[in-house]
Regions:
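The catalytic Nudix box helix
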Residues: 65-100, 114, 122
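N-terminal strand-loop-strand
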Residues: 20-66, 70, 92-93, 116-118
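Cys/His-rich microdomains that often coordinate metals
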Residues: 13-16, 33
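Nudix hydrolase/Nudix homology domain
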Residues: 1-6, 17-18, 60-64, 106, ...
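Short Cys/His-rich Zn2+-coordinating modules
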Residues: 6-13, 26-27
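Active-site-adjacent beta-strand/loop module that shapes the phosphate/pyrophosphate-binding cleft
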Residues: 102-124
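Short, basic and Ser/Thr-rich N-terminal targeting/leader segments
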Residues: 3, 10, 37-39
Length: 167
């Protein structure tokens, strides 16, 4: 994707060539460029034996997932977690814990997963982003994302911490 969309220099319009394994160079103006990442965070918010699950308008299929969103320029990953949860659900969180990351099937995407404890607030969804949001107990989980997704890996790992597994 990156190679196909960076054939010409954005400064002078001349053809770009591979310079290193991860950069391109313009021979005319000597501008060097690297792939840009679109970094997003995703977070499993837990409260006792319950987790916060959402249904976003852009979800394909009838499943519930986790709050996620893009990191803004100049923002830490942890602040992005707090901001996205507050914006989409009205909740506050604490004790944010890194889980892992996964390349995301959005061009140049990287999804970074976290856990966070519920700190306060009532669920009030951002209707432009979400259809529904709510707390679900270990024993009453709805349809959740596919096993290959980082959302599912977060959920499965949380269930293992609780001595359980997903159906």
């Amino acid at each position: 994707y990156w190679d196909a969309t960076t054939q010409y220099c954005g400064t002078c319009g001349s053809p770009m060539r591979i310079n290193t394994g991860i950069s391109k160079l313009c021979d005319k103006c000597h501008r060097e460029i690297w792939p840009q990442l679109a970094t997003a965070v995703i977070c499993l918010v837990h409260k006792g034996d319950e987790i916060l699950l959402v249904r976003a308008h852009n979800f394909r299929g009838n499943f519930h997932g986790l709050v996620a969103g893009f990191v803004e320029t100049g923002e830490t990953l942890e602040h992005a977690v707090e901001r996205e949860i507050a914006e989409e659900t009205g909740l506050t969180v604490r004790n944010i814990e890194y889980f892992g990351s996964q390349p995301w099937p959005y061009p140049n995407g990287l999804m970074v997963g976290f856990y966070a404890e519920y700190a306060g607030g009532e669920v009030h969804i951002q209707e432009e982003e979400l259809k529904t949001a709510g707390w679900f107990s270990i024993d009453n989980l709805p349809v959740i994302p596919e096993k290959l997704s980082i959302a599912r890996k977060l959920i499965d790992n949380w269930l293992l911490r609780k001595g359980r597994t997903a159906e």
